[in-house]
């Protein structure tokens, strides 16, 4: 409960840094300026003579006071020296702010406590510095510095406060109670010191709980913004800080502190309120007397100088002990700033040597057994070591080890800094995990089945060879390998081994990666019989200025010039003031086919469905299947006894095929209750139409129907697109309109909309096959402007089938691309808005691609650019294909 309160407090402070900082500073200034608590304005030496104070000062032990000040300065110096070993300038700066502001707050409290008498600070500040503890402040700063984003900074500060807050609160309470015992001693000088100590602890606690976390959050936020959103504070050796700080304090120690606190509270209560005050501690009952400010012995005098001149003269006139203290502080400051920086950097470089180029770790083999990681620097060494490893495996009898340990460590990022010897040591430490030794020869199937079915053992106690043996014997279905293995990756690895033996070239899968992939998001959602994943280059085009916003559009493609061309179109649109877009319609469709005994029956059912009563019945059944699916309309056609019903419904942020299919099935069941003679032939009767060219999608629309437009100034057409408005309009008419009509195209009145649609679909986890209908587009160009030299362009796409949840959008790389566009996941405030926004981005990017390609065609640059940028430089004669090998 207490940790939760501190967590909420930390999150609030980190989320509102400006408010907390301004409020804290304002409160401090008010404490300095207000005069309600101390009614008298007596200042010793200026308007009052304080003979007792002067006598005490003259009789005080100057040597001890000087030593105390020097020790305090050395203590702060060593604390900052320890912070420098962390290697982060941000921790140093934040700790400095913490110290300065804590001193400021403490000075304010002391001034008020002494009735605005600044001479008390001379003895107070050393005790404050001795009680300053930067360890917790630096620990909280390290929590924040281990973050990757500003949101994570706030969350980590909240976690740090939840962990450190209760401990720090208890420690501050215990310190105040322990030090406060000295205020009851009756010794005036000890009472003053203990009073200063208590105020020091309280000031430190106040700053740590308010100003400091807000300052940390604000500093890191400003640092992030100064580098275009990239976190510049994160250090590699902070990666483990959360694990280290998560260790809770010793509960025994905490209980002892609590018991001590209760005991000290009783002591204070008894001494201050229950016991009779004795003459020896009567000074403790009167703060004025205990602090040597007895007004009975003070005499008022007329000031000879102004107050600021009085304070200035006291600051300039320094005693010998003050000169010693100031000299030591300046000497340590110079040493810390100028002479220790190189030494610290040298020490850090020895701890974390960085060499360039960085050695990378490659996985070599694709066999069933674990093998030590091999470090390679070039392909020649890679193949030589691979061949040697294969020969050694043939000659030697090895102990087969399952992939469990490797898979457990494979998901942790391995950062290699330093030389290869250090790397080898780190790899050995990582791989030293408990492993069971398995026999080289496969055991009988019966024994293997018993181990597999044993809940305490399972597949991790079987070698890959034994698993393959069970698959070949039909005891394990090949499609269930991932679910039966201890890790999905091992199941994929075994399937690759099974498949490699059946391929014309056993090493065919060598360059198809499969490691370090989150297959849990794939199984049962995206793919079956997985043997790896296909890396595709992802480029970015942008910024695309659309509806007053800028988007960096990810495009996954292997076609050269595509991203560059689209990027040029985005630049032209941006220079023209940006594009505007609107969503005309939003509705996914599913078109089942049902059959009736006679054609007249089909016609009658069609007529009934067109009535408000019939539509209401079907809509209620359809809408009951989902909180997002809402039937909009029915479009029907009769072909003999067959009735084709096209259901159109919104689907939120999902593309919606599964959602609409579920609603369609429920609606057909309801329709069958009214017409029992109806026969459901198929939930999909190709009347949708999905993944096939269809005029109904072009005319009626499917998914999101979007229109996008822009005006490109004549200067941009000439200087960026390298052509003229007249030439582009002429090419557009004769190519995109007349040419497509001559070819009998359906929805293909564009230059290459499918290129952009498919590239974005692959990058953002969409169904790539739906580029067939989604690429329906008509591109229109007109002359505009006062002189008709500007270019007006529009793209209308009536059937963009797209979504931001479900399917491939659940995969992390695809989610990253969606996050680039700000449309990842479902929109909570307005369901479906993310998908509609993505459709507008697709249409706007298509228009950019159309603009650039049409300009290249008009200027005659297309062939030349592709010859330069889209031609492979590999000598194909040096590559032997499968047919060549067979012929040889």
Curated annotation (Swiss-Prot):
Positions in coiled-coil regions: none
Pfam families membership: HMG-CoA_red, Sterol-sensing
Catalytic reaction annotation: (R)-mevalonate + 2 NADP(+) + CoA = (3S)-3-hydroxy-3-methylglutaryl-CoA + 2 NADPH + 2 H(+)
First-listed, main subcellular location of the protein, grouped into a coarse class: endoplasmic reticulum
Listed CDD domains: HMG-CoA_reductase_classI
GO cellular component terms, A-Z: endoplasmic reticulum; endoplasmic reticulum membrane; peroxisomal membrane
Annotated InterPro entries: HMG_CoA_Rdtase, HMG_CoA_Rdtase_cat_sf, HMG_CoA_Rdtase_CS, HMG_CoA_Rdtase_eu_arc, HMG_CoA_Rdtase_metazoan, HMG_CoA_Rdtase_N, HMG_CoA_Rdtase_NAD(P)-bd_sf, HMG_CoA_Rdtase_sub-bd_dom_sf
Compartments where found: Endoplasmic reticulum membrane; Peroxisome membrane
Positions bearing the Glycyl lysine isopeptide (Lys-Gly) (interchain with G-Cter in ubiquitin) cross-link: 89, 248
PTM per Swiss-Prot/TrEMBL: Undergoes sterol-mediated ubiquitination and ER-associated degradation (ERAD). Accumulation of sterols in the endoplasmic reticulum (ER) membrane, triggers binding of the reductase to the ER membrane protein INSIG1 or INSIG2. The INSIG1 binding leads to the recruitment of the ubiquitin ligase, AMFR/gp78, RNF139 or RNF145, initiating ubiquitination of the reductase. The ubiquitinated reductase is then extracted from the ER membrane and delivered to cytosolic 26S proteosomes by a mechanism probably mediated by the ATPase Valosin-containing protein VCP/p97.
EC number of the protein: 1.1.1.34
Bilayer topology: Multi-pass membrane protein
Single Gene Ontology MF annotation: NADPH binding
Known role: Catalyzes the conversion of (3S)-hydroxy-3-methylglutaryl-CoA (HMG-CoA) to mevalonic acid, the rate-limiting step in the synthesis of cholesterol and other isoprenoids, thus plays a critical role in cellular cholesterol homeostasis.
Homology family: Belongs to the HMG-CoA reductase family.
Protein name, as recorded: 3-hydroxy-3-methylglutaryl-coenzyme A reductase
Organism of provenance: Bos taurus (Bovine)
Annotated gene: HMGCR
